[in-house]
Amino acid sequence: MFALSNNLNRVNACMDGFLARIRSHVDAHAPELRSLFDTMAAEARFARDWLSEDLARLPVGAALLEVGGGVLLLSCQLAAEGFDITAIEPTGEGFGKFRQLGDIVLELAAARPTIAPCKAEDFISEKRFDFAFSLNVMEHIDLPDEAVRRVSEVLKPGASYHFLCPNYVFPYEPHFNIPTFFTKELTCRVMRHRIEGNTGMDDPKGVWRSLNWITVPKVKRFAAKDATLTLRFHRAMLVWMLERALTDKEFAGRRAQWMVAAIRSAVKLRVHHLAGYVPATLQPIMDVRLTKR
């Protein structure tokens, strides 16, 4: 445990320097990207912490696959750590400024990933991977079942695809911070003003179109189609996410004040740990591991 913590401290220090270089460049040359950078930097930090135990079990030089690299902050960081990483990008709509920021990231990175410029559901590779992952990507993929199949095809035996994304059984849409009403279509009719009037996105209509309304039952069906995969949901992730709302200012800033206040009260009373006992189907997020037999 001490060795893992010590290594994570070194990784965080390296990542701090990398993010500081990009932040300085953005402030000087592309200030219009600062808000996007802050969001993506917070997500990359969270993702690296989330993956720490998975990555600690892998040897240096292990072949990694990031499904949806976004602005490539995490992929570049992992490449700098010595991993042989491939990032699938692009996928989905509604990400106009991502390419601009991604180009800056690649320009300033100490090491770069191999980039597969295709949708996840079109990915083909002769390479076999030790580990695959994605954070808040599966909800934007046009054909998530096909994406799972393509990833399964390139995993080594014993390797996992670990992903985190919303669960739309729960009546909340996190990108727009709105309640949902049974279906995407009905939600759009009821919440159209909030969706189209969102000023925190470059292209809110495009982001909305990209959402596929993925759910835990759908993921179970995807996995059931592939006899070589075993499926596991990590329910305790919800506890960590609740705690994140109090420690990550950028993350909390994208949530309603009443929601953050309620979470703060729950954490103070320590009752937020009960969230880990909620069935995966009823949780607002899903932390999924698909392991290749």
Swiss-Prot record:
Q: Name one Pfam family in it.
A: Methyltransf_23
Q: Which SUPFAM superfamilies match?
A: S-adenosyl-L-methionine-dependent methyltransferases
- Indicate what this protein is called per its UniProt record: Uncharacterized protein Rv1509
Instruction: List the InterPro entries.
Output: SAM-dependent_MTases_sf
Superkingdom in the source lineage? Bacteria
List the GO molecular function terms. Answer: methyltransferase activity
